């Protein structure tokens, strides 16, 4: 019979059990909901890959990740389970437990009867934790299994004579395996020691542990295995010296080769000796021999592996570094130039004289007429004000490109630099934020703008394509599909930006005016995922936490859901093994709007190559990482209407091999399309990427020096020029100085960003589209800011990817030109006046323009009202670059007048303000030359008139006629080109 006290405990026990079951139920519910979310995300991700025709790539990647996880987990589980089984097998059959062994007694009472279950659970849990890190190695695993060999004369590293592919494809995964194996053995050894203690094989009766003989055998074998794994690690560490950053340059330098390499070899043999000692100790009593072996190992690791190399570096290398490091500097130079794609840069000299003649100025009117009057970074508000048409439209990015304008009467026309932007919907500015508005009605942007960067009408841009519905001027390309479902910089981003197309709710195309009803449309493409059954709808409703998808009668089985609509996010999701540029840009091709995104293959394992300087890159650039190898071998092209994505292998354009891309093409056959299959209308708009040239220019400034001693002394080393800035004149970037680790003063000036320009490259006969950046000599604190050279990257199909450096005499560089502009009284007075009269001044980016054998700089001067802030182009600044204070500044209300201010030549337009002409500008010319100049002036004047009027067909014809006259003028005057070295 129960006592009253026992009866009183029953309700309390029942209540506690009830609360426990409630907690368990809540936990199970939370896990279930989380699992549903995970499963829904997993399933809908697969549907997304299927929608862009990459389902096979998704499956392959999933199988690899799952295989790595379960493979490493199974391996760890088996080894640990066997070891714990051995522990149970070696447990003493009889054990006298003292008072201090209470923990062991309880363990044996409660756990020993369930030893197999406990062993299995522990092995499973620890194995799953240990294997989780293997999932992230999928990239290295795929490169390991499918990596191809490098070919060519520099295919082997100079130290170990192994193919470079070994370092890029094999070494990273092998290093992971060795590291994982060693850490796993350490974890297993700890678990085994604990298990032996709980089983009584290890006793600590009075503070001095005792180990049973059979336990010593077990632990000795485990420790020997750890020593063997460490030995393999030392072998791999030898190869990793090729990536060392301990010397003057990256790679195995003198101390690495003559001190660290022998030390690693010695440590390899000592680790093998330690393994043998541990196995020999199985038949000996005590641990004296293993302790001696491990102690010797630690002593050698410290003395030979750390202290000895430090002594060699300090005593032998540092006093004679310029002599001892020369062979290794030579290796670093060759590897870096090859790995970063700057080993085939063409070098030319550019005289940069101030001797332009009148015929030369006129002969270069195609270049002067193509300077960018409209800087997309500063004038974006102007384009938005004039062309957004509705508050909910925005131009999230403006890009610089070039387009061919057709001429009349069969004339070939001409190429014009264009500012290009796509009109996208900004969700945050919609008239209403309801679910229907956000996801069903305002689903897409509409149309694009194409505006000549070299033309202005009433201080505002001219437009080749504008308005809604889209209008194309004569001679300009036509848009047949203006709807934009996929774009850049989606304001919401992620899953929140999904839209539904082809629903019962008409989608808004555009509203021509506030008094008119919106024009609507229905989607007829195959973009996104079709909601064709109950399970697909349910999965997306769970993923987004939005059950309107499930219950709305506006959504049908034909509706298509688009939920990854940012171009960069799409590419990152589809090809996570590539790195991506910071600046996708739109292209109009065949009446369709496409987005082009540059993609890179990168590595930080190229032997002897220096890590790239990426400090000047935008924060969202995929090249913002540790890398010492890069290739722009892929162009991603996305249709703005359908979202269909193509990855084009463009390595054939630059005629450079890319073994990393070749490897990914083996891994994912059919994913990459040869550039030969890219439509010609798209190929015509490929650009050399800014991010890549930013990295290459930063490195080439030093690595154009190929003599090791000159490289060591930094003789003739260059930096990318300090930026001249842009925007408000009073926001000039401040110059600050810091001291580096060698005690030298370094400047923290921002560097000049590359600029796309359409101009006649010295030595060429016609303008081409190029990416340009400038060099200045390396100096303490950037105190020397004269130009040292100009790097030009070709973007036209005929010279795509060709890098040319024009070395110049010490003429004023961009920062000095900026100072000259600020010191010009006409400019500074105008800025002061405008900034105090209800307006403000914005300066565009400074452009470097080679003209003949001279160098010009151009900068647009915008004025915006404080009450209606969108910039208008009011003034033009042109600088004729000289040296030591001889640069001349032209400033006027038209480009023609500013040029006349410099050259005192007869140009179409206004009369100049009359400054003293530069040397040679008044040379007498023959009557024939004068007639050609007059004809060129007439043709140029007519071309500008047609351009401002938006008659692009006539403009193309005018430009073609002008080119013919200019060719005659060049022949008549013998205009010189640059000399080559």
Predicted features, each with a name:
Residues 3-13, 19, 25-50, 54-949, ...:
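Soluble extracytoplasmic regions of secretory-pathway and membrane proteins
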């Amino acid at each position: 019979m129960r006592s009253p006290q026992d009866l009183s405990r029953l309700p309390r026990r029942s209540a506690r059990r009830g609360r426990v079951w409630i907690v368990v139920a809540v936990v199970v519910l939370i896990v279930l909901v989380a699992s549903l979310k995970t499963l829904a995300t997993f399933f809908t991700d697969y549907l997304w890959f299927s929608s862009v025709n990459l389902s096979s790539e998704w499956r392959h990647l999933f199988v690899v990740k799952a295989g790595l996880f379960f493979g490493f987990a199974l391996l760890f589980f088996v080894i640990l389970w066997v070891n714990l089984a051995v522990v149970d097998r070696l447990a003493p059959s009889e054990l006298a437990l003292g008072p201090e062994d209470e923990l062991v007694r309880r363990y044996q009472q409660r756990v020993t009867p369930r030893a197999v279950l406990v062993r299995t659970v522990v092995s499973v849990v620890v194995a799953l934790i240990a294997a989780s890190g293997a999932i992230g190695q999928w990239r290295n695993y795929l490169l390991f299994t499918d990596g191809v060999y490098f070919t060519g004369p520099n295919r082997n590293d100079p130290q170990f004579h192994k193919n470079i592919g070994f370092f890029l494809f094999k070494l990273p995964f092998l290093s992971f395996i060795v590291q994982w194996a060693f850490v796993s053995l350490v974890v297993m050894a700890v678990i085994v020691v604990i298990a032996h203690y709980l089983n009584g094989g290890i006793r600590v009766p009075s503070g001095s542990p005792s180990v049973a003989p059979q336990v010593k055998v077990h632990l000795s074998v485990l420790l020997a295995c750890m020593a063997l794994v460490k030995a393999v690690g030392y072998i791999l560490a030898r190869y990793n010296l090729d990536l060392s950053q301990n010397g003057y340059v990256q790679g195995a330098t003198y101390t690495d080769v003559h001190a660290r390499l022998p030390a690693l070899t010695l440590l390899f043999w000592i680790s093998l000796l330690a393994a043998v000692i541990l196995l020999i100790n199985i038949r000996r009593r005590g641990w004296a021999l293993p302790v001696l072996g491990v102690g010797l190992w630690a002593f050698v690791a410290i003395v030979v592996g750390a202290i000895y190399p430090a002594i060699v570096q300090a005593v032998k290398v540092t006093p004679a570094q310029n002599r001892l490091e020369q062979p290794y500097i030579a290796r670093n130079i060759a590897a870096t130039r090859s790995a970063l794609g700057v080993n085939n840069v063409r070098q030319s000299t550019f005289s940069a004289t101030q001797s332009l003649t009148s015929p030369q100025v006129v002969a270069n009117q195609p270049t002067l007429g193509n300077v960018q009057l409209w800087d997309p970074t500063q004038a974006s508000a102007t384009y938005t004000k004039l062309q957004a048409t509705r508050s909910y439209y925005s131009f999230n990015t403006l890009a610089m490109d070039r387009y061919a304008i057709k001429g009349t009467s069969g004339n070939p026309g001409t190429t014009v630099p264009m500012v290009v932007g796509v009109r996208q919907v900004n969700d945050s500015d919609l008239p209403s934020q309801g679910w229907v508005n956000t996801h069903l009605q305002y689903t897409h942007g509409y149309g694009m703008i194409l505006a000549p960067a070299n033309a202005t009408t009433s201080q505002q841009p001219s437009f080749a394509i504008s308005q809604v519905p889209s209008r194309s001027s004569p001679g300009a390309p036509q848009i047949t599909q203006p709807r934009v479902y996929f774009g850049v910089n989606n304001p919401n981003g992620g899953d929140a930006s999904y839209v539904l197309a082809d629903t019962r709710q008409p989608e808004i195309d555009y509203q021509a005016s506030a008094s008119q009803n919106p024009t609507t449309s229905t989607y007829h493409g195959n973009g996104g995922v079709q909601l064709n059954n109950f399970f697909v709808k349910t999965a997306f409703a769970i993923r987004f936490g939005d059950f309107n998808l499930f219950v709305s009668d506006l959504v049908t089985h034909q509706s298509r859901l688009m939920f990854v609509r940012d171009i960069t996010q799409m590419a990152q999701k589809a090809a996570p093994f590539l790195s991506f540029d910071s600046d996708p840009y739109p292209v109009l091709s065949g009446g369709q709007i496409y987005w082009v995104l540059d993609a890179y293959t990168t590595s930080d394992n190229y032997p002897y190559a220096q890590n790239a300087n990426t400090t000047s890159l935008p924060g969202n650039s995929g090249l913002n990482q540790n890398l010492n190898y890069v290739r722009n071998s892929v162009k991603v092209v996305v249709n703005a209407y359908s979202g269909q994505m193509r990855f084009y292998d463009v390595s054939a354009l630059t005629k450079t091999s890319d073994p990393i891309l070749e490897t990914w093409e083996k891994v994912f056959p059919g994913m990459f399309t040869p550039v030969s299959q890219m439509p010609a209308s798209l190929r015509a708009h490929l650009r050399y990427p800014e991010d890549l040239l930013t990295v290459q220019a930063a490195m080439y400034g030093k690595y154009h020096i190929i003599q090791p001693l000159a490289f060591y002394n930094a003789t003739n080393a260059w930096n990318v020029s300090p930026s001249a800035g842009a925007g408000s004149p009073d926001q000039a970037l401040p110059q600050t100085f810091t001291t580096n680790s060698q005690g030298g003063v370094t400047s923290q000036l921002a560097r000049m960003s590359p600029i796309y320009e359409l101009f006649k490259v010295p030595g060429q006969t016609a303008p081409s589209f190029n990416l340009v950046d400038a060099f200045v000599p390396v100096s303490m604190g950037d105190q020397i800011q004269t130009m040292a050279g100009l790097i030009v990257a070709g973007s036209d199909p005929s010279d795509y990817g060709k890098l040319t450096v024009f070395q110049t005499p010490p003429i004023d560089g961009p920062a000095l030109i900026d100072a000259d502009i600020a010191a010009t009284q006409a400019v500074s007075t105008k800025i002061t006046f405008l900034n105090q009269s209800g307006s403000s001044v914005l300066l565009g980016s400074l452009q470097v323009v080679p003209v003949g054998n001279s160098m010009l700089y151009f900068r647009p001067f915008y004025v915006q009202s404080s009450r209606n802030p969108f910039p208008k182009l009011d003034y033009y600044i042109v600088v004729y670059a000289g040296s030591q204070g001889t640069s001349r500044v032209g400033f006027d209300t038209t480009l023609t007048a500013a040029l006349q201010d410099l050259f005192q030549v007869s140009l179409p337009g206004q009369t100049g303000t009359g400054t003293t002409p530069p040397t040679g500008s008044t040379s007498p010319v023959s009557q024939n030359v004068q007639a050609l100049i007059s004809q060129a002036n007439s043709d140029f004047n007519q071309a500008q008139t047609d351009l401002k009027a938006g008659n692009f067909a006539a403009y193309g014809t005018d430009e073609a006629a002008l080119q013919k006259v200019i060719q005659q003028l060049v022949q008549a005057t013998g205009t010189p080109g640059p000399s080559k070295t």
